[in-house]
Regions:
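N-terminal Rossmann-like NAD(P)+-binding domain of SDR-like oxidoreductases, especially those catalyzing
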Residues: 2-192
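Glycine/proline-rich active-site loop of Rossmann-fold NAD(P)-dependent oxidoreductases
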Residues: 165, 190-206, 213
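Charged, solvent-exposed alpha-helical segments that act as regulatory interaction surfaces
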Residues: 145, 210-213
Length: 213
């Protein structure tokens, strides 16, 4: 897939945060199959999951960056020059978010703001960058209606859910204030063989699979 930029043609590129998670891995495969050059944001040169990505997804080029550090995000965007950014990175353990509320807010909430600010600074009319934010059903928290829709009131009941609400509204704010192509998708619980075994639902599905086999 090529895309005309100022009269030139350039391979479409995408940058994925949360590349080591189940969604990041599957998304990378889909984009690669569509002809994209795929980059994955990873924190630290010695990240223990880097080897896994290099083995399982050899077509992904890992770049260093940290959702807690604006300058590192700017550097990552300047290096990758992506057409699209998919923000799947977060501290996604709801129970853990009560024990590490500040860290959860800093990464899962403020990390969205930093990434959008980096996109605003690096992108522009000549290099527009599209942004996708992975929002969560945890934003609904104390559910008032079933099923939930985009219009359902948000009532988070955990630091994780509150951080996701901040990221969700920040995405709207940057779209309306700066004209960025920024959107959110509200994700509900979903399982796959790539989901970490540390998640309760993954433990259940893994046990069922073992019994079946």
């Amino acid at each position: 897939v090529v895309h005309p930029i100022d009269g030139r043609f350039r391979l479409r590129t995408a940058l994925i945060t949360g590349i080591t998670g189940q969604d990041g891995q599957y998304l990378a495969e889909v984009l690669h199959d569509e002809g994209y050059k795929v980059y994955g944001l990873i924190k630290g040169q010695r990240n223990p999951k880097a080897e896994m990505i290099n083995t399982e997804l050899p077509f992904v080029e890992l770049v260093e960056g940290d959702l807690q550090d604006l300058s590192s995000l700017i550097a990552a965007l300047e290096y990758t020059q992506p057409h699209e950014v998919y923000n799947l990175g977060a501290i996604s353990f709801v129970a853990l978010s009560f024990k590490q509320a500040e860290l959860t807010a800093n990464i899962t909430g403020l990390g969205v703001l930093r990434l959008l600010e980096a996109i605003r600074l690096v992108g522009g009319q000549d290099n527009p960058i599209r942004f996708y934010q992975a929002s969560s059903s945890e934003m609904f928290g104390k559910v008032r209606e079933t099923p939930q829709t985009e219009l359902t009131p948000l009532h988070p009941r955990s630091p994780y859910g509150s951080a996701k609400v901040f990221g969700h509204h920040t995405t709207v704010n940057y779209r309306e204030s700066y004209g960025l192509y920024a959107c959110s998708g509200i994700l509900f619980n979903h399982e796959s063989p790539r989901r970490g075994i540390e998640f309760v639902t993954r433990k259940v599905t893994n046990a069922v699979a073992r019994i079946k086999l």
